[in-house]
Structure formats: structure tokens, C-alpha cells
Amino acid sequence: MGSCYSRKNKVSTISLDEEEKKKEKKKKKKIYILNGASGSGKDTQCRLLEKKYNYKIICISKLLKEYKEEYNKENVLNEEENYFDEIEKCMIDGSLVNDQIVIEIFHKQLNKYINDDKYNGIIINGFPRNYEQALLIIQNNISITKFINIQVGKDTLWTRINNRIIDPITNISYNENIIQIIKKKREGQELSDKEQKQLIIDNHLYNNLSNDILERLTKRKDDEEQVFNKRFQLYIESEQKINSLFKNICKNVDGEKSINDIFDQICSIIDDNPN
């Protein structure tokens, strides 16, 4: 009888230890913000980081759609009922969702992923976008591990955007010059040493592209210089205010370098903050 009691007690202790480990893991889950202007390569870096670290990538536009799909007016709190109409309206007319609503939904969905053992950490892609959103993050006591800022000059940003084409189905962007090199190679044409080197550098991003994907790639309608200039100016004005709130945890990355070099810089920041 004493032996049975001891075995049960042992199982109970193990169970408690496992629960404590789970709680500790959730408490230690790192949250990084990846900041940068349009064309700085945030999406590309997020895909690479997601694969290496098994992190959940949070993008606000996708988060709002996800929230709308997961919930309905019957299963949310009363104060959230008007969120659906607001999100629906903004999705239709292209306007911005109210900052307070964005933060409320962001906080709710963020907690879901913090408590999900499937992910080792979280990377927030390109959010907050303005000072008000950044301030709300601080006021809601959302603990950010590091604010990683990809710094790229205006001329480089415009060159990248001008050479950017996207997959309209996945919304993944690619470099048009590299796509042309891939097409040239598949057509059996001889590549220059420079073109061969470019394919080797970016092979991990482009080697699985099917011919169907290559054919449907297209330019974004808003990738025009006038639109870019306006967005860049707004970004610069917001960045200075946002960075002031995260100055103690801000780490700058040289975004003028290659994709792999930028990735190594970001990985170094993450690896300096182990769980």
C-alpha cells in the first residue's frame, strides 16, 4: 500500500513539475518587434527567422483578418461587438482601423500565441506604425524583448521597391532582377558570372519557385515613386517618436547589406537574449 501511495505521489510531483515548466516557458517567451520602412526587407527576414527559430510572425493586417474569422458577434465580449463593423469597413474602403481597436485585438491575439507551446517566441512585423500605437503598447504593459530597427537609406529603399514584384496569391515579394535571371536560366540561356553569383546568394529564397508562380508575379499598384515618397516621409516622422519609447531596448541593423548579412545581424541580437 505504501508503494502504491509513493508511486501516485511521484506521478503527481512530475505532473506539477511539467506544469511549472510550461508556465516558466510561457513567462520567458521572447517578443521582438521588427521595424523598418517599406522596402527594408522585413517580410523576407521574418520568413527566415520563422524557419530558424520556430517563432510566430505577427502582422497586423493578417491579425485583424484572423480575428474576424475566428470570432463572431455572438462569442465576443459586448464591448467588442463594434470591432467587426469597423474592421469590415476599413477592409472595404482601405482606411485605417482605430488604434485602440487595433491594440485591443493585438493584445488578445498576442496572449493566445504567448500561451501556445507550439511557438518558441514571437516576432511582430512592422508594428507599431505610429506613436499612438507605440504608446498603447507601453501602457498595456506588453513586454518587448528587443526593438530591432532595420536601417536603410531612401535611395536604396526606392531601388528595391522599384525592382519589387509580388505573388498576388501569397503576397510574397521578390526581386524582379533575380526573377529575370531565373527565367533566363530555365530557358537555357547562358548566365554571366555576376548572375550566377546572385543566384547562389539568394538561392534559399528562390529555388522552389514553380513556373506557375513565376508567370503570375506582378508589380504592386502602389509601388510608384510619388506614393513611396509620401510613405517614406510619414515613416521618418513616426520613427523618431516611436524609437524614443523603445530607446532602452532598440537595436539597429544595417539594412544596406545583403539578405544573409542582415539575417546574421538579427540572429546575433536574438541569440544574445536566450530563453
Swiss-Prot record:
Tagged with keyword Cell cycle: no
Top-level EC class as recorded in UniProt: transferase
Keyword annotations of the record: ATP-binding, Kinase, Lipoprotein, Membrane, Myristate, Nucleotide-binding, Palmitate, Transferase
Modified how: Myristoylation is required for cell membrane localization.
Record region (NMP): 59-97
Membrane-spanning residues: none
Gene3D superfamilies, per the entry: P-loop containing nucleotide triphosphate hydrolases (3.40.50.300)
Compartments reported by the entry: Parasitophorous vacuole membrane
Main localisation: membrane
Lipid attachment site numbers (N-myristoyl glycine): G2
Binding residue positions for ATP: G39, S40, G41, K42, D43, T44, R164
Gene Ontology molecular-function annotations: adenylate kinase activity; ATP binding
Superkingdom, natural source: Eukaryota
GO CC field: membrane; symbiont-containing vacuole membrane
Descriptive protein name: Adenylate kinase 2
Complexes and interactors: Monomer. Oligomer. Heterodimer composed of NMT and AK2; AK2 myristoylation stabilizes the complex.
Database matches in CDD domains: ADK
InterPro entries hit by this protein: Adenylat/UMP-CMP_kin (IPR000850), P-loop_NTPase (IPR027417)
Keyword Transcription: no
Binding site for AMP: S95, L96, V97, G126, F127, P128, R129, Q133, R220, R231
Membrane topology: Lipid-anchor
UniProt-listed Enzyme Commission number(s): 2.7.4.3
The reaction(s) this protein catalyses: AMP + ATP = 2 ADP
Organism, as annotated: Plasmodium falciparum (isolate 3D7)
Effect of C4A: Partial mislocalization to the cytoplasm with some localization to the cell membrane. Mislocalizes to the cytoplasm
UniProt region (LID), positions on chain: 165-214
Recorded family membership: Belongs to the adenylate kinase family.
